[in-house]
């Protein structure tokens, strides 16, 4: 399945908007002698078309990923553990849709986490953002992320669509009491591949009984 092929759509940080296959094999459409070409562009667009945005031509774009993840969640609600597919493609490993969505969420969350090299992928190679105490823990929500290394690209204030990372964290690590606490605690999140915490989510106290009047 191309969607879960690490040589096509599946990157270490989520799903690409366009298959990396087209890096070396551009798609060419001929319409009455006029050729139009699209290739894999993991970072900023190579043309000024659409203002130079390349959201849907290769980068990791959160609206697309969020729709796919939530759709796979619904598939699991219907199929349960009975249906498994190979993930990643070519790995020989069969997973159900719940396991696949968990891994996809982990990949997306890892964009913002400090990795083994001491860097947050989302800050790319901008030293000030990576190491300056005034910046390093104040995360930005970029418009989209490099399809291969997850460096943040485009506008850095997309608190609408990229902000859905908060809900993905809540869905993956259900112990977070509220979305308001999510981003403050993101630096403490376990690295991808570790087990979810076992501490139960705080329960909501029952309302106090009212006296009869």
Give the positions of each predicted feature.
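Acidic, mature catalytic/reactive cores of soluble proteins
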Residues: 1-213
């Amino acid at each position: 399945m191309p969607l879960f092929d690490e040589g096509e759509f599946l990157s270490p940080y989520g799903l690409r908007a366009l298959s990396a296959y087209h890096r070396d094999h551009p798609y060419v459409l001929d319409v009455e002698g006029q050729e139009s070409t699209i290739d894999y562009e993991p970072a900023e667009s190579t043309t000024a078309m659409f203002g130079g945005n390349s959201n849907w031509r290769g980068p990791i774009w959160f609206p697309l990923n969020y729709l796919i993840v939530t759709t796979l969640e619904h598939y699991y609600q219907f199929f349960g553990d009975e249906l498994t597919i190979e993930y990643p493609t070519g790995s020989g490993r069969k997973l159900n849709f719940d396991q696949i969505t968990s891994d996809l969420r982990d990949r997306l969350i890892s964009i913002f986490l400090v990795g083994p090299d001491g860097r947050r992928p989302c800050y790319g190679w901008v030293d000030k953002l990576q190491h300056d105490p005034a910046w390093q823990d104040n995360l930005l929500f970029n418009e989209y992320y490099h399809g291969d290394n997850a460096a943040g690209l485009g506008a850095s204030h997309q608190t609408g669509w990229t902000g859905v990372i908060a809900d993905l964290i809540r869905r993956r690590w259900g112990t977070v009491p509220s979305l308001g606490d999510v981003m403050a605690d993101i630096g403490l999140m376990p690295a991808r591949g570790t087990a979810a915490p076992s501490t139960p989510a705080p329960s909501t106290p029952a309302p106090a009984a009212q006296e009869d009047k």
